[in-house]
Design a protein with these regions (language model features):
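Extracytoplasmic c-type cytochrome modules immediately beyond a signal peptide or single-pass transmembrane anchor
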Residues: 31-139
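Flexible gly/pro/ser-rich segments immediately N-terminal to CXXCH heme-c attachment motifs
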Residues: 136-143, 167
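Conserved structured core elements
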Residues: 10, 142-145
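Short, solvent-exposed loop/turn and secondary-structure capping segments
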Residues: 157-166
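The canonical Cys-X-X-Cys-His
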Residues: 145-155
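N-terminal Sec-pathway targeting helices
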Residues: 5-26
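Short Fe-S-cluster ligation motifs
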Residues: 174-184
Length: 184
């Protein structure tokens, strides 16, 4: 009788362990798959807006990239990989208006004023945040934060062409950005 009872419990323990193991594998695979978007974004234009005027009044109608061996995926990974700098709630940043108007704080014109590079939406940047600004998740909530690219990507516009330099010093004014963000 004891042997039959032990086999019965052992059978159910094995089944339970199998179910738990399968659930853990599914959870791990799902988590990895959700993070892989950073590595599959290979937009050939790297999310660059191809027409514009910078804060100095220089116009450009195309963007090229300094030949430094970076693929489109490399650039987009650099632009959109969080550094854990959770600045403010993401949903708040998306709808935040400028302090002196009803225009969005994140509008291309306003972002360009600070020397940051406006972007169009891509797989890894679905809301079209500027280069170096990213959605990050912390304790179950989404935040807007900065990546290394905020301070280390620049674009020089000359003769109608924007030359994007990934990893170079940005031509941005973070102090004014932060002051105006606080005022908004």
């Amino acid at each position: 009788m004891y042997a039959k009872s032990a086999k019965y419990y052992l059978y159910w323990i094995k089944r339970l362990l199998l179910i738990v193991s399968v659930l853990i594998v599914i959870w791990l695979v799902s988590g990895i798959a959700l993070q892989l978007y950073e590595f599959r974004d290979s937009d050939p234009d790297r999310g660059a807006i191809m027409n514009g005027t910078d804060k100095f009044g220089d116009r450009f109608s195309q963007v090229t990239y300094l030949a430094q061996g970076w693929s489109a995926s490399d650039s987009l990974w650099f632009y959109n990989t969080s550094q854990g700098s959770n600045l403010l709630p993401y949903s708040f940043f998306l709808v935040l208006e400028q302090s002196d108007s009803s225009a969005l704080f994140r509008s291309d014109e306003n972002i360009d004023r600070y020397g940051y590079l406006p972007q169009r939406p891509t797989i890894s940047n679905p809301d079209g945040l500027p280069v170096g600004m990213v959605r990050d998740r912390y304790q179950g909530k989404n935040y807007m934060g900065f990546t290394c690219a905020a301070c280390h990507t620049t674009q020089i516009n000359y003769a109608g062409t924007g030359m994007r330099i990934d990893g170079g010093p940005a031509n941005s004014d973070m102090e004014s950005f932060m002051i105006d963000l606080a005022n908004a």
